[in-house]
A protein has these predicted regions:
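Short glycine-aromatic motifs
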Residues: 24-25, 50, 111-114
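Conserved short beta-strand elements that form part of the metal-binding/catalytic scaffold
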Residues: 5-16, 51-86, 92, 131, ...
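Amphipathic alpha-helical segments
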Residues: 35-51
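N-terminal beta-strand motif that seeds the catalytic metal site of vicinal oxygen chelate
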Residues: 2-38, 88, 148-179
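Vicinal oxygen chelate
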Residues: 35-38, 89-138, 146, 166-179
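Short glycine-enriched loop/turn motifs at secondary-structure junctions
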Residues: 23-26, 81-85, 122-123
Length: 179
């Protein structure tokens, strides 16, 4: 049995659209920009282990484990660098796999044009690290002992919407993308 099927017994979350104007049945995809599809695809497949398909001349779709995809669009020099808070999470099965991925990111930094590799940390209930790829997209390689998506929604709101966001405490805002 694959790790995906082992961890995610039921991958369907019923849409809660009774009170909404739009009545979606699924959140299907996201997008990110890249300088070069060819170079980015090499990183996605060889380093991150993502499945890629070139469905359009300026774009590829990438996925891993779930039927949710990211559209990577080649925009050349028009890439808009993003902050680490705008990142894509990739889950691995153990803390040791996080450590191995971190070591590999440092080892193959030049081969895959990885711009930054931040230290491994224990934060927000996960053991993880962030890295900035060749296109200024950020990735979090993480281990969580369970299925985080399910747990977050099962636990429900921990704070009232009247509670302040405490934006000044977000240390991630101090992390700068590379030039």
């Amino acid at each position: 049995m694959s790790q995906t099927r082992e961890k995610i017994q039921d991958g369907i979350a019923d849409a809660k659209t009774e009170q909404s104007i739009v009545k979606p049945y699924v959140m299907s995809h996201g997008t990110m920009e890249c300088y070069s599809l060819k170079e980015s695809r090499k990183f996605y497949e060889e380093f991150l282990g993502l499945e890629c398909v070139r469905h359009a001349k300026p774009a590829i779709v990438v996925r891993c484990g779930l039927k949710f995809h990211i559209v990577a669009v080649e925009v050349g020099a028009a890439v808009h660098p993003v902050n680490v808070l705008n990142h894509w999470g990739v889950d691995v099965a153990t803390k040791e796999e996080v450590d191995k991925a971190h070591e590999a990111a440092l080892k193959y930094k030049d081969k895959y044009n990885i711009r930054q590799v931040l230290p491994v940390v224990m934060q927000h209930g996960v053991y993880s690290f962030y890295m900035e790829d060749l296109d200024h997209n950020w990735w979090e390689i993480q281990y969580y002992p369970g299925f985080q998506n399910e747990d977050l929604f099962d636990f429900g709101d921990r704070f009232s919407m009247d509670d302040g966001a405490e934006v000044g405490e977000l240390k991630e805002l101090d992390i700068k993308t590379t030039a």
